[in-house]
UniProtKB/Swiss-Prot annotation:
This is Female-specific protein transformer. Keywords: Differentiation, Nucleus, Sexual differentiation. RS domain directs localization of proteins to the speckled subnuclear compartment and the purpose of this localization is to allow colocalization and co-concentration of components of the splicing and splicing regulatory machinery to permit relatively high rates and/or efficiencies of reaction and interaction. Coiled coil: none annotated. It comes from Drosophila simulans. One of its GO terms (molecular function) is pre-mRNA binding. Residues 59-75, 84-114 have a biased composition (Basic residues). Residues 1-39, 49-58 have a biased composition (Basic and acidic residues). The keyword Nucleus applies. GO terms for cellular component: nuclear speck. The sexual regulation of tra occurs through a mechanism of sex-specific alternative RNA splicing. The non-sex-specific RNA expressed in males is not translated. It comes from the Eukaryota. It is found in: Nucleus speckle.
Length: 184
């Protein structure tokens, strides 16, 4: 059933038109009886929107009876969205089952026998991150691919390679991977 935010399903209550609605319902469909309107006057409505208010009253009225009386023909509020949704769902599933059983023999034969395909396994390797990279510790000078040099290289590189003037040097730039020393 199609519903807008405020329509509360009243206009198009059932997809099956005349069959599900009793003749009394069909007769009195649009109009509200005088008795209702007289009763309504001194009450303060719960919803400002009168369509929703009607619907609420109707469902309340229906809930009073619900326990005792179960009739074959559905009462007006019974065929409101809840009931019809259940009914429609049941019907849909039944028809789906029927069609499946019809087509299953054909399909079963042509498909290749079912192989067991496990989902791909995810393999974790744990790689050690040297501590000076991880929490930029004052690092060992490392030369990649070789053992670290047994003693420091013969003469240390000159501290400033710049010809004219050094760019502004504050705290050395700190990222996890490239830090020779921590940022302070």
């Amino acid at each position: 059933m199609k519903m807008d935010a405020d329509s509360s399903g009243t206009e198009h209550r059932d997809s099956r038109g005349s069959r599900s609605r009793s003749w009394r319902e069909r007769e009195h469909h649009g109009r509200t009886s005088e008795r209702d309107s007289r009763k309504k006057e001194h009450k303060i409505p719960y919803f400002a929107d009168e369509v929703r208010e009607q619907d609420r009253i109707r469902s309340l009225r229906q809930r009073a009876h619900q326990s005792t009386r179960r009739t074959r023909s559905r009462s007006r509020s019974q065929s409101s969205d809840r009931g019809s949704r259940h009914r429609r769902h049941r019907q849909r599933s039944r028809s789906r089952n029927r069609s499946r059983s019809r087509s299953s023999e054909r399909r079963r034969r042509q498909r290749s026998p079912h192989r067991y395909n496990p989902p791909p396994k995810i393999i974790n390797y744990y790689v050690q991150v040297p501590p000076q990279d991880f929490y930029g510790m004052p690092g060992m000078r490392q030369s990649f691919g070789y053992q670290r040099l047994p003693r420091p290289p013969p003469f240390p590189p000159a501290p400033f390679r710049y010809r004219q003037r050094q760019p502004f040097m504050g705290a050395p730039r700190f990222g996890y991977r490239n830090a020779g020393r921590p940022p302070y």
